[in-house]
A protein has these predicted regions:
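Intrinsically disordered, low-complexity, mixed-charge
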Residues: 1-90
Length: 90
């Protein structure tokens, strides 16, 4: 298992980035959350099989059709094993 935190910069708010991230993470069978930050970035934590987490991070570099991703900063975290779904949080 692998858990990461990612901060996504660019035009990532107001373009369905969070909802699309939820869809992609659920499709990959991951758990965690995604939220908008006040600085205009999107933050997410995702946990699951290492190859599936890597697939989500690869997707994050493009995001949904109207997004423009400039940077995805990734931090490795300790696996928690406490979540059961992937959702939008505040």
């Amino acid at each position: 298992m692998r858990r990461v935190r990612a901060i996504v910069s660019g035009r990532v708010q107001g373009v369905s980035y969070r909802a699309s991230t939820v869809d992609e993470a659920r499709r990959l069978g991951l758990v965690g959350w995604v939220k908008n930050r006040v600085d205009g970035t999107v933050e997410l934590e995702a946990e699951g099989a290492p190859d599936r987490v890597a697939a989500l991070l690869a997707w994050c570099n493009d995001g949904p059709p109207h997004a423009r991703v400039d940077r995805v900063a990734v931090e490795e975290l300790a696996v928690t094993g406490t979540e059961t779904a992937f959702s939008v949080t505040r």
